[in-house]
Design a protein with these regions (language model features):
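Short loop/turn segments at beta->alpha junctions
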Residues: 98, 219, 280-283
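ABC transporter nucleotide-binding domains
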Residues: 2-7, 12-197, 201-210, 215
Length: 297
């Protein structure tokens, strides 16, 4: 599949602190890529770099097949940004503006703006066009950003914690919108989120970042369908590690007060060989925890 977004070696430092460390990232057409990591790991900084909102020390961003960064000329910016819908982690609109005025400003900024589509999303999200931005909760501000992001018919959505502050029903509604968006295989979504259960519902690929460095990039189904968390005692871990069932380097462990949790790459193979060892399906949150804090078996 064609990559609508490609980041190659993105590096950014502030003084002695490296906030992006040779970040590689790709978002193919027709896909939803989930972007996970702890607060301060580099998710928001990466998205800002993709949007050309900050200079980089090294690396490059390629959007829709052409290089793009903060120094791109006005024509390139208009052409590329016109194909991107963005939802940032904080609402960027002037607090004293009404929703209707926000729509008017967006119409002036985007030649492809569709007022009818904007109004449709306002109704869907129950946003009163007469209200001012400052009257909205965090969740309502996210809905307003999403309505704006969709109303100019972009090809890519870059969403930074777009479901934060939403109740479960509203989150499911947003996920339905994203599924519909990528049903057009010329579209794609990059979604950063701490709500990993949302990503388990819709993502195709999960990318993890820690301390500015990409630490994994895997198909979501590999994590949630194939991997498992084995609940072992010390003797069982020794048997498992020495069995030859897995490459020992592929096993990671977390030592708990009640025993040892082991991340295994194939829970079905474990069940066949060691049926006496309890094993649960892995979640994205499990996998991230093992990668960041687990030990090699």
């Amino acid at each position: 599949m064609t990559d609508l977004i490609r980041a190659e070696g993105l590096t950014k430092t502030y003084g002695s602190k490296t906030v992006l460390d040779r970040v590689d990232l790709r978002v193919p057409a027709g896909s939803i890529v989930g972007f996970v990591g702890a607060n301060g790991a580099g998710k928001t900084t990466t998205i800002r770099a993709l949007l050309g909102l900050m200079p980089l020390d090294a690396g490059r961003v390629v959007l829709f097949g052409e290089p793009f960064d903060i120094s791109s000329d006005a024509a390139t910016c208009q052409r590329v940004k016109g194909r991107i819908g963005a939802v940032l982690d904080t609402c960027p609109f002037v607090p004293d503006l009404s929703v209707k005025t926000v729509g008017s400003l967006m119409k002036a900024a985007y030649p492809t703006w569709r007022a009818d589509l904007f109004e449709e999303h306002l109704r869907r999200f129950e946003l009163d066009p007469r209200k001012k931005v400052k009257e909205f909760s965090r969740g309502m501000g996210m809905k307003l950003q999403l309505a704006c992001a969709l109303a100019h018919e972009p090809d890519v959505l870059l969403l930074d914690e777009a479901t934060a502050g939403l109740d479960p029903l509203a989150r499911d509604e947003v996920l339905d919108i994203l599924r519909a968006f990528v049903s057009d295989e010329n579209h794609a979504v990059l979604l950063s989120s701490h709500i990993t259960t949302d990503l388990e519902k819709i993502a195709d690929v999960i990318v993890g970042i820690d301390q500015g460095r990409i630490v994994f990039s895997l198909e979501k189904d590999v994590i949630t369908d194939e991997m498992g968390i084995a609940r072992c005692r010390s003797a069982e871990l020794e048997d498992l590690a020495s069995s030859g069932l897995y490459d020992q380097n592929s096993l990671r462990v977390l030592r708990r007060p009640y025993g040892i949790d082991v991340l295994v790459p194939d829970r079905f193979a474990l069940a066949r060989r060691f049926p006496e060892i309890p094993c649960d399906k892995a979640t994205i949150e499990d996998y991230l925890q093992f990668v960041l804090t687990g030990e090699q078996a």
